[in-house]
Regions:
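N-terminal amphipathic/hydrophobic targeting modules at extreme N-termini
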Residues: 1-11
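Acidic, Ala/Val/Gly-enriched low-complexity intrinsically disordered segments
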Residues: 3, 17-19, 154
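Extreme N-terminal starter segment of soluble prokaryotic enzymes
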Residues: 22-26
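Short glycine/serine/threonine-rich phosphate/pyrophosphate-binding segments
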Residues: 30, 70, 132, 155-160
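Short Gly/Thr/Asp-enriched flexible loops that form oxyanion-binding sites at enzyme active sites
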Residues: 39-41, 45, 149-152, 156-169
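Glycine-rich nucleotide/cofactor/substrate-binding loop typically near the N-terminus or early
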Residues: 47-119
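Anion-binding (especially nucleotide phosphate/pyrophosphate-binding) glycine-rich loop
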Residues: 93-156
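Conserved small/polar residues in nucleotide/adenosyl-binding loops
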Residues: 177-178
Length: 178
């Protein structure tokens, strides 16, 4: 059995039989930013292995690092996709989604405050995580008792203040002024 990284975002597990023939290959790819999702990468790699080693059982298991694609990985494992209207990183309305598995919500910050949503407007003084808080509030209102929050792929630098505000927190100065 051999395990190791091929690249920073792709791991593999290879098993050979007694004759040294490749019997099973498990491919564990993350996404390739801006080009392939982890599912697309896994499917492509699986096909390539099967073309080169037809006797090999190749299995792709998509993974994510908490950014884009995290929710999709849970959806592939049977979670339900839940959509909600939220505020985007620059105040625009948008529909974001999270995964629900029993009473657990898996929310990726990228769905409400991700880099692709910035569309070139990289302005850390204006970008907010408010929509992420709205997703958390939606999940809680729908009965989720646990929240898993993936923090990758954000276009914000508000330290979660927008998220906390959406959940009811108030931020005051020394004079109790908002």
């Amino acid at each position: 059995m051999k395990v190791g990284p091929l690249r920073p975002n792709l791991y593999y597990l290879i098993g050979k039989d007694g004759d040294g023939m490749l019997k099973k290959c498990i491919l564990i790819p993350d996404s390739f930013k801006g080009t392939l999702t982890s599912q697309q990468a896994g499917s492509t790699l699986r096909r390539a292995v099967q073309e080169q080693y037809p006797e090999c059982e190749a299995v792709a298991v998509p993974v994510a690092d908490g950014g884009e694609g995290t929710v999709d990985c849970f959806l592939q494992q049977g979670a339900r996709k839940i959509e909600a209207a939220v505020t985007g990183p620059f105040g625009e309305p948008l529909t974001a989604a999270y995964a629900r598995l029993r009473d657990t919500a898996v929310i990726e910050i990228a769905s409400a405050a991700g880099l692709p949503l910035a569309e070139g407007r990289l302005d850390p003084c204006r970008a907010t995580t408010y929509g992420v808080g709205e997703l958390i509030a939606h999940a809680a209102a729908e009965g989720c008792r646990e929240i898993v929050l993936g923090l990758g792929g954000s276009c914000t630098n508000d330290a979660g203040i927008g998220m906390a505000r959406a959940l009811g927190a108030r931020f005051l100065d020394r004079k109790s002024v908002v």
